[in-house]
Amino acid sequence: MSTGGPQKLEAQGGKEGKEWDDGAEHDGVTKIYVAAGGLGIEQIRFDYVKNGQPKEGSFHGVKGRSTISTIEISHPAEYLISMEGWYDSTNIIQGIQFKSNKHTSQYFGYEFLGDGTQFSLQVNDNKIISFHGFADSHLNSVGAYFAPISSSLTTTPNKVEAQGGNGGETFDDGVFDHVRKVYVGQGESGVAYVKFEYEKDGKRETRDHGKMTLLGTEEFEVDSDDYITSIEVSVDKVFGYNSEIVTALVFKTSKGTTSPPFGMVTEKKFELKDGNGGKLAGFHGKASDVLYALGAYFAPSTTSTTPSTTKKLQARGGNGGASWDDGVFDGVRKILVGQGNDGVAFVTFEYNKGSQAILGDGHGKKTLLGTETFELDYPSEYITSVEGYYDKIFGVEAEVVTSLMFKTNKRTSQPFGMTAGEHFELKEDGYKVVGFHGKAGDLVHQIGVHIVPIFTNYRVAI
């Protein structure tokens, strides 16, 4: 291994076509364009940053009638660490997938089913800074240049001082990748309790502080493609406490969403915000039986590598239960639906991410009636629409989902539940379902979907 400069990994695939080389003088990759067609990957292009300046790359291959999909990488906090794929006897790249230090892209082209040659471009403790290969009418091969991951890429989060009083015990949740949900519980005089749902390396973690009262909690959920940019903290001196306490919280996001005020807004307000436009990454402060003070960590904002064509269709049903969101995957493998006496009591979904089958969390509550399963012939089969009904049932304040039915590119499932009430359909022509979200308590109150364009082709043995 050379230590004097970038390391060049040999191109994988066929050597047909014209050799291309984007050069090894870049700092990193900022954008990827991929067109996948009937015979494999038709065309690819990479944009770079060089000496801090953006540099557009060239297209390699020829795009037919396929759609170009893009991946954006937020340099320098995010960088590519690997590219995986495969090619067959035609010596054309059939499928590829990219991984960064923060995300894994959707799979482009045909997924590997065992007939062909797989490859992986990766060097430990290095990042991809450029690509090379061969291409003609299609992408025949691809290789990469690697450089060590500079310590300068590791940015120190900005810790914004806690605002409020001096009472209570100090807490510090630390720094996470995302803040997904905030729960705020009121007391008689101010904010008595907070709970934060974080995400780090794809896993959810919660931290709570203060003491919950009989008033319960209110919640503010952040969409998967959004993040909190500021928190307004109201504080006041309240009878019975030796120092000021937090009386209200208001959250604002990068997409312009503002939460309702959680608590009593006062004239004395502070704003927790990063001067560099960063995103909220964690909380610290002081609490005991109430929240005395709140501060925050902010980290550089990053752009998700989920293709920008991903859409989130609004959930349908009643406004009950707690919000949930499984996020975006490559596809759906299996659906389990559990019935209750009056509606859908429980759902869980098995997804595919890269080469892994991932079982999502259960939503709702299983009953003695058990669950029914709808299994897809993944990857050649995918969900194109979700239909169902929701209705008001005795003893439950908000409407519940009473029936679900799933349509794929090959067939339609049986109806799970009772087809009564208000009908709905979650569908967009030319798109497939790659994730679910909704609301649930003891029953499923709402169901919604994440969708992406159907541009991936799957090879099926005949």
UniProtKB/Swiss-Prot annotation:
Jacalin-type lectin domain sequence ranges: 6-148, 157-300, 310-453
Gene designation: MBP1
Induction: Up-regulated by methyl jasmonate.
GO CC, alphabetical: nucleus; plant-type vacuole
UniProt note on tissues of expression: Expressed exclusively in flowers, in male and female organs, petals and pedicels. Not detected in pollen grains or sepals.
Disulfide bond residue pairs: none
Alphabetized InterPro entries for the sequence: Jacalin-like_lectin_dom, Jacalin-like_lectin_dom_plant, Jacalin-like_lectin_dom_sf
PANTHER family: JACALIN-RELATED LECTIN 12-RELATED, JACALIN-RELATED LECTIN 3
UniProt entry keywords in alphabetical sequence: Lectin, Repeat
Region (Disordered) location: 1-23
Biased segments, Basic and acidic residues type: 13-23
Family matches, as SUPFAM superfamilies: Mannose-binding lectins
Protein name: Myrosinase-binding protein 1
GO biological process entries: defense response
Source organism of the structure: Arabidopsis thaliana
